[in-house]
Design a protein with these regions (language model features):
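Short amphipathic alpha-helical segments that mediate assembly, nucleic-acid/protein binding
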Residues: 3-5, 30, 180
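Tubular lipid-binding modules of the TULIP superfamily
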Residues: 14-154, 161, 218-219
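Cleavable N-terminal signal peptides of Sec/SRP-targeted secreted and luminal proteins
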Residues: 2-17
Length: 219
């Protein structure tokens, strides 16, 4: 399997963040990953996606079967361009590559937003406002390989150690006149983080299998 496939996948995982510190390394693999991350970041920042600020935007569509109105006010999304690289290390003697990167926080605030749709004379409406913060998004793991970049590399196995530090949500959600805020806040603040933690091993194993499947398909 080609090493470039895995390296590209790892770089994409960091595509929404910029290293918060400069890392000098003589390892060609680590340099390659860092350079790819920086290239993605340039695209993201150049597109104005971090920070993303929307003061006021509205949309309206009127069709024969569908009429739609939507608006967003005072939206701000930050944090995607901040990544902490805890470890990127290639042990050529053991044929192991360790990586550990963290996005400290992704933050979303919405002053007000809403949507109203008329589908075949059935009206559906929803309102959303509030804040959402995801803390310490961690992508870590270990890759075992055979060979070298000169003669070719085969990925033998991947072990993932992903997770989040927590979710803080304070949102107001109304759908068709019914207030679902309390239930959604409980789900985001408690149920979802607890579920991710309880099934962390299964999620990491599944993620590793998916990455291996992508690598196998591309090679």
């Amino acid at each position: 399997m080609k090493a470039s496939v895995f390296l590209a996948l790892l770089a994409v995982a960091g595509a929404f963040a910029l290293p918060s510190q400069d890392i000098e390394t003589k390892d060609i693999t680590t340099d390659f990953i860092i350079n790819l991350i920086h290239r993605y970041i340039e695209l993201i920042k150049g597109a104005g996606l971090d920070p993303l600020k929307i003061k006021n935007v509205a949309y309206e569509y009127n069709g024969n079967l569908l009429q739609l109105k939507a608006f967003v006010e005072d939206l701000q999304f930050t944090g995607a361009s901040n990544i902490v690289i805890n470890n990127l290390h290639n042990n050529i003697f053991l044929s192991l590559y360790d990586f550990d990167v963290v996005i400290p926080e992704l933050s979303l605030t919405v002053g007000d937003s809403g949507i109203e749709a008329n589908i075949w004379e059935n009206i559906v409406s929803a309102e959303f406002r509030g804040s959402l913060s995801i803390k310490n998004i961690r992508l870590a793991g270990q890759v075992r390989y055979r060979g070298s970049l000169i003669v070719g590399v085969e990925i033998v196995s991947i072990v993932m150690q992903t997770g989040i530090g927590g979710i803080e949500a304070d949102v107001n959600v109304i759908a068709n006149g019914n207030d679902h805020s309390a239930a959604i806040n409980v789900f985001l603040n408690d149920t979802l983080p607890n579920t991710l933690e309880n099934y962390r091993n299964e999620i990491n194993a599944l993620l590793a299998r998916i990455i291996m499947a992508i690598i196998n398909r591309r090679t």
